Regions:
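Conserved active-site and cofactor/substrate-binding residues in soluble primary-metabolism enzymes
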Residues: 16, 68, 155
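C-terminal cap/substrate-recognition subdomain and adjoining C-terminal extension
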Residues: 1, 75, 82-218
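Active-site neighborhood of HAD-like aspartate-dependent phosphohydrolases
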Residues: 1-49
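Metal-dependent phosphoesterase signature
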Residues: 56-92
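Amphipathic alpha-helical segments within well-ordered protein domains
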Residues: 22-23, 62, 191
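Short, compositionally biased "basic patch" segments
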Residues: 44-47, 54-70, 129, 134
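Catalytic cores of transferase enzymes with a strong primary signal for eukaryotic protein kinases
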Residues: 8, 15, 53, 71-74
Length: 218
């Protein structure tokens, strides 16, 4: 069985789940609306340009998780999934997932976005295997710290190698679908790298290396 790996944000989703969580928090005044929105947008631009300081970003993103009760977080997350995520699940993304399921492939999402947000999104997409950045939790509350290696850039390779070892799989016949040049380290590891609605940097690399370029939005 081959491994079909999917990035999440702007690949299977027509938007960025991490950024939209920030928008949700700001719109509902769970955080200071203007300052949080401005900082959230600045980090998103850093991500797009390949300049993101992942540790600074995670400190920013995890602060609301640490400051609020789990019950409040779960209530907000359920509302956010309805308002922000369900409308941006791409039908062609669902079709692609189903294609690989019918082939008998093992399905895996790997995302830099944290597991608090992405666990239910993976469930909505019907994918059981998820590698995401994990926020640390102690005694039922988030601490604001990251647990282990963030699954970002080369960190995706590190986390995937650990997952492969744990599950006794390998990358023979593997696919990886991504929109972002930030995922080049992992795209270079798989047998079939596929650029999905790629950013300019990834599109250029994909053309140079004769990788398949696919749109799930058209």
């Amino acid at each position: 069985m081959a491994l079909a790996i999917f990035d999440l944000d702007n690949t299977l989703l027509g938007g960025d789940s991490d950024y939209l969580w920030g928008r949700y928090l700001a719109e509902n005044s769970i955080v200071d609306p203007q300052s949080y929105h401005d900082t959230n947008l600045a980090f998103y631009h850093d991500y797009q340009s390949g300049q993101l300081d992942i540790n600074a970003f995670l400190q920013f993103v995890f602060e609301p998780l640490a400051k609020n009760s789990m019950q409040d977080l779960l209530n907000w997350r359920a509302d956010y999934l309805q308002q922000k995520i369900l409308p941006i699940i791409l039908p062609k993304g669902r079709d692609l997932i189903e294609h690989h399921r019918q082939q008998g492939d093992i399905l895996l999402i790997i995302t830099a976005t944290n597991s608090f947000l992405t666990t239910p999104i993976a469930e909505l997409l019907g994918i059981d295997n998820l590698i995401a950045t994990d926020p640390e939790m102690i005694d039922g509350r988030y601490t604001g710290q990251v647990l282990g290696v963030p699954s970002f850039q080369h960190g995706k390779v590190v986390r995937l190698k650990h997952w492969l070892s744990e599950h006794q799989h390998d990358l023979q016949g593997s696919y990886f679908y991504s929109d972002s040049h930030n995922d080049l380290p992992l795209l270079e590891q798989v047998d079939t790298p596929i650029a999905v609605d790629p950013d300019d940097k990834l599109a250029e690399v994909a053309r140079q290396r004769d990788w398949k370029i696919l749109s799930l939005r058209e």
